[in-house]
Amino acid sequence: MIGDPGQIPPTVTIAVDRWEVSPVAPHMPAPEVAMENPDLRAVTQLLELDTCRRLPGDAVELVNYFYDFEFSAFAAKGERFLRPTKKTSDSRIDSAILTLNDHSTVIYTHPTGADGAPIETDTELAQVAADFVSRLLALQCEVSTSAAETNAPRILTAADIGIVSTHNQMNSAIGSCLPSALMGEHGIRVTTPERWQGLERAVMIAVHPLSGVQTPSAFDLETGRLCVMASRHQSACIFITRDHVGDTLNSHLPAADQALGRGDTIGRGHAQHTAFWQYHEKRNLIV
C-alpha cells in the first residue's frame, strides 16, 4: 500500500459507532488500520519519503504541521515563484498577489457583514475567487515550477490554475463566476479536496474550510482536507476566507466525543487549524 498520513479519510454515510474501537475498522484508511493494529504492524514495513518534490520550501515547512514526521523540500530556495509582469494596483487582491513574490502561501480575508457570513453558499466569496483568477491573468504573472524554469519563467495560463473548496455548491458557484472559455479539460479545474488528491497545479486558490462556519463540526476540522488544499501547488497558493476564522478558532472549544481508545481527532484538527492560521499571522501573510 502507498498511504499518505495527510490523506482524507473515506466518506461513510452510515453509523459506524460499533466499529470505532475495532482493530480492523472498515471505515478507516487502510494504512492507518495497518499501523495501529499490532498484528498487522508486526508484518508491515514502513518506508517514509523524506523529500517533497511538489512544494516550495516554505510550503513544506507549513505542511509539516500535518505530519508526525519531518520532511524537506527538493526545491531550492528561490526556485519557485509567482510574480506580476504588469503594473499592479493598490487593491487588496493585488497586494495579496504581490505577497507571493517572497512566499508561496497567503490568506486573503473578505469582510464579514454585520449579519454574519452567509448561511448558504457564499456567492460573494465565489466572486472573489474569480476576481483572483482575473487579476492573475491580467497581470500576466510569470511562474516558475521547477529549476528548469527559474531563469526562464513562463507566463501563467488558465491551465496552470486550480480552485478547491470543500463543498460542491461552492465549487459550482465559483464555476458560474468564471468565463466558460477558461474552464474545461485544458482550463481551470474547480472541485473538492477529495478529487484533488494526487493532482497539482502551478497556482491554487483555496476557500478556507472554516470560512462562514461559526461552530466548526468534525467535518470542518478534519485535517486531511486542509492538508490537501495546502499542498496541491507547485509555486503559489492563495487561501480566501471570511475574516472571522481567527476569532472562531480562538473561541471554539472542541468537544472530545471520540470513542474510548480512539485518538482525539477533533482536538487535533482544531490544534492544526490554529497552527496553520498562526503560521500566516506571525509572518504577516494575512491580507
Regions found by a protein language model. Name each.
Residues M1-V287:
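Conserved helicase motor core of SF1/SF2 NTP-dependent helicases
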